[in-house]
A protein has these predicted regions:
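Positively charged n-region of N-terminal signal peptides that target proteins for export
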Residues: 1-7, 443
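Bacterial N-terminal signal peptides
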Residues: 6-18
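Sec/Tat signal peptide C-region and signal peptidase I cleavage site
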Residues: 19-23
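Cleft-lining beta-strand/loop regions that shape enzyme active-site pockets
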Residues: 26, 31-43, 47-64, 96, ...
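Glycine-biased strand-turn-strand hairpin within the trypsin-fold
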Residues: 26-45, 49-57, 63, 78-106, ...
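Extended, small/polar residue-biased N-terminal targeting/export presequences
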Residues: 55-119, 163-167, 171-193, 416-440
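Acidic, polar loop-rich interaction surfaces within structured domains
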Residues: 297-300, 308, 312-318, 323-380, ...
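Conserved functional hotspot residues or short segments at active or partner-binding sites
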Residues: 347, 352-443
Length: 443
């Protein structure tokens, strides 16, 4: 490819990419360039000088398309961990991924201190089943060190044909030696919503990611829980643990199911078109049953929007550990060659005006995911174990049995605490206040 054509393409990309973000941004008339545009022209002169020197003097004939791709990647990598350039194939895969299907390992990553760091594994994927955790640092991918590797290059290396193997070197916090994980790539079909019912009429909805159909599937899950309970729900658990985020509009729609008015989230950027406030509507608002939202350090982005909105409106109790702290909004910008940019264009704020960027959502009830061992029956002594104990008088109502399968959650300490909180609330609201004798006072 000739150098003038390369320069022409670069100028087109460099000067028109911001227009792709919003059709409202019009180019300045000739002679009316802004200070920012004039500064860009000056830097382009330097870029063209370097590109010319490479083409004329490099020891081998340079691949100009690779140079251009590398230059664009370099620009984006200087911004923040979430801005990136996506070549055509990767851009196409990204669009498919929002539908909930792709070939890979099922792990959401970011860059922290120039290291590829796990935000969270997606439930029931190769990464999750292998035991990869939020906060793990991926130091090697198939023997290639990842230090200073771009996030998109790391994703590209971890993607691959279904059934192919990949080896990851993982450094875990608190450990001195790396771990090695060999995983087999799968077609990851992410079911963003799972639900179940606990006694007494307490619904549980797990949201693994916010995809294009998540809000609709969430609403369907609530309907299914109502039908299964055959009575109004007495409480709801929303599990956002290890949810790396996803689509902003889906998070807003999920919040709108539980809020009838007021602000859900606002975004603020450098341009007026990036400033927007999303408000709740009265349509289809769920009844006012109590809600507990579960979060942890793997809860990021869109999941933090949901937790923050319900917390600020005092519509839910947030339980677990502090969230990831990703409080920025990325715009997906398609380019003319079918590649694309993922560019950070705004910060988002919870209804109270709080930015959670690098801070995260602080839970109302802090509960670590402790390792909890169920006590076996022979380790406890109860009345029925005593010699000559009295039998209960007849007739006797059979004890309430929780739904089948609840024993599967016994190792999930945070979920158990959340259930206890909702069940306790149901019990406490039926208590009668103790009459107070106005003639006496405690001292």
């Amino acid at each position: 490819m000739q150098l003038p054509l390369i320069i022409s393409l670069y100028l087109c990309l460099f000067l028109t990419a911001p227009v792709c973000v919003s059709a409202q941004a019009a180019p300045s008339a000739p002679g009316n360039e802004t200070t920012e545009q004039l500064s860009a022209y000056e830097h382009l002169d330097q870029f063209i000088d370097v590109l010319t020197l490479i083409q004329k003097n490099y020891v081998e004939q340079p691949a100009m398309d690779e140079l251009m791709s590398g230059a664009i990647k370099g620009m984006l990598s200087e911004l923040d961990p979430h801005s990136a350039y996506m070549p055509p194939k990767m851009f196409e895969e990204m669009q498919i991924e929002t539908m909930g299907e792709f070939n890979g390992l099922g792990v959401e990553i970011t860059i922290k201190d120039h290291l590829i760091t796990v935000i969270s594994p997606i439930a029931d994927t190769p990464a999750d089943r292998a035991g990869i955790r939020a906060g793990d640092i991926i130091i090697e991918i198939d023997g290639t060190l990842t230090k200073d590797m771009s996030i998109m290059d790391a994703i590209n290396q971890m993607r691959g044909p279904r059934g192919s193997e990949i080896t990851l070197g993982i450094m875990r916090h608190g450990e001195t030696a790396p771990r090695t994980f060999t995983l087999t790539r799968e077609t990851i079909r992410v079911d963003s919503i799972r639900q179940r019912l606990f006694e007494p009429a307490i619904g549980y909805v797990r949201v693994s990611q916010f995809q294009q159909r998540t809000a609709r599937e969430f609403k369907d899950a609530l309907k299914a829980l109502h039908e299964e309970a055959d009575t109004p729900l007495q409480g709801l658990l929303i599990d956002l643990r290890n949810n790396p985020g996803g689509l902003l509009d889906q998070a807003v729609q999920v919040c709108d199911l539980f809020l009838s008015s007021g602000k859900i989230v606002s975004t603020e950027g450098r341009r007026k078109t990036d400033n927007f406030t999303y408000n709740a509507t009265a349509a289809d608002t769920q009844p006012g049953y109590p809600i507990v939202v579960l979060i942890n350090e793997g809860s990021a982005s869109a999941s933090e929007i949901v937790a923050g909105a319900l917390q600020d409106h005092k519509r839910a109790v947030i339980l677990g550990t502090g969230s990831f702290g990703k409080g920025s909004v990325q715009s997906i910008i398609p380019l003319t060659d079918h590649s694309g940019l993922r560019l950070t264009t705004a910060y988002y704020y919870t209804p109270n005006g709080t930015s959670i960027q690098a801070r995260g959502i602080v839970p109302d009830v802090s509960v670590e995911q402790a390792v909890w061992k169920k006590t076996t029956p022979h380790e406890l002594t109860k009345e029925k174990d005593l010699n000559n104990h009295l039998e209960p008088p007849s007739p006797q109502s059979p004890p309430k049995q929780d739904m089948a399968g609840e024993d599967k959650i016994e190792s999930d300490f945070q979920l158990l605490r959340a259930l206890d909180l909702l069940r306790g609330w149901q019990q406490m609201k039926h208590l009668q206040p103790c009459p107070v004798d106005g003639g006496h006072a405690a001292s």
